[in-house]
């Protein structure tokens, strides 16, 4: 973490912090600084992960274009693996939607018909009372 800072420099920073902030505020300041450092590390790791994912997607796209140019015949094992990964990803994306649509459609249909009838009856009864 402190690659360019030696022990003496850390000791000097600690003593200066103790003199400037005092013994009561120094622990709070150290905690807040370590929190900032953790947040920056998390952000950096998040950006790194997103870039790696985008590079992997870009590599898969380029492999797919190479496969299209070769006519999907006599593909190298590397290109075939990329195509298989794309097919698996497409299937995994489609599967959750198919599973969710079936139960929600059957469970929402009876519940929607019953409430829609009740408010209709209430609405038709309310205008008669307000006109009298």
Swiss-Prot record:
Region: Disordered; residue ranges are 68-132
Q: What's in the keyword line of the UniProt record?
A: Cell inner membrane, Cell membrane, Membrane, Protein transport, Translocation, Transmembrane, Transmembrane helix, Transport
Bias class Low complexity marks the residues at 102-122
Q: Name one Pfam family in it.
A: TatA_B_E
Q: Which species does the entry assign this protein to?
A: Shewanella woodyi (strain ATCC 51908 / MS32)
| Gene3D superfamilies documented for this protein | 1.20.5.3310
Q: Give the principal location in a single coarse category.
A: membrane
Q: Per the UniProt record, which residue ranges are transmembrane?
A: 2-22
What's this chain's function?
Part of the twin-arginine translocation (Tat) system that transports large folded proteins containing a characteristic twin-arginine motif in their signal peptide across membranes. Together with TatC, TatB is part of a receptor directly interacting with Tat signal peptides. TatB may form an oligomeric binding site that transiently accommodates folded Tat precursor proteins before their translocation.
Q: What cellular component terms from Gene Ontology apply here?
A: TAT protein transport complex
What domain of life is recorded for the organism? Bacteria
Which residue windows are coiled coil?
A: none
According to its UniProt entry, one GO biological process term is:
protein transport by the Tat complex
Molecular function (Gene Ontology), one example: protein transmembrane transporter activity
What protein does this entry describe?
Sec-independent protein translocase protein TatB
Q: Is Transmembrane set as a keyword in this record?
A: yes
Tell me its family: Belongs to the TatB family.
From the Swiss-Prot or TrEMBL record, state where the protein is found.
Cell inner membrane
